[in-house]
């Protein structure tokens, strides 16, 4: 019976590359000359530091563009509120990985409401979908992509 898994993961190597490229762009941009600004990757969180809140916003946009170039969905970013410490501003950006239980339940409900001949089951931080025909599984993937749940999903472990 054909099946596949729905997961939400981020390639940490690509994330590190995106942060390094964003730091490199900061060093060459004219509006960040003589400004103490940097991106710092700590595990799966990015710490953004700059001298002003406006610069933090610009830096988030720089990071977003480099994530897109590296095929990391920017919807996985969870930006916390900026904090002012002295003359510097800091912001932590966490990257969501895995599918939490409420989202998994919404996903299963979405699949069941689509009235496709597939079964969905929650298995930890992923959802397994099984069906009799490969076409049903592909229709399920299309329905999930249409739904826009705010979390980037990847489809892997496709078995026939």
From Swiss-Prot:
Q: Which GO terms describe its molecular function?
A: nucleotide binding
Domain of life here?
Answer: Bacteria
Question: What InterPro entries does the record tag this protein with?
Answer: DUF520, UPF0234-like_C, UPF0234_N, YajQ-like_sf
Cellular component per GO? cytosol
For this protein, the record's Pfam families field holds: DUF520 (PF04461)
Renumbered to this chain, the signal peptide range is none
Going by the UniProt record, its keywords in alphabetical order are: Nucleotide-binding
Q: In the UniProt record, does the keyword Transmembrane helix occur?
A: no
Family note: Belongs to the YajQ family.
Explain the purpose of this protein: Nucleotide-binding protein.
Q: By its UniProt entry, which HAMAP family does this protein fall under?
A: YajQ
Protein's name according to its UniProt entry = Nucleotide-binding protein VIBHAR_02358
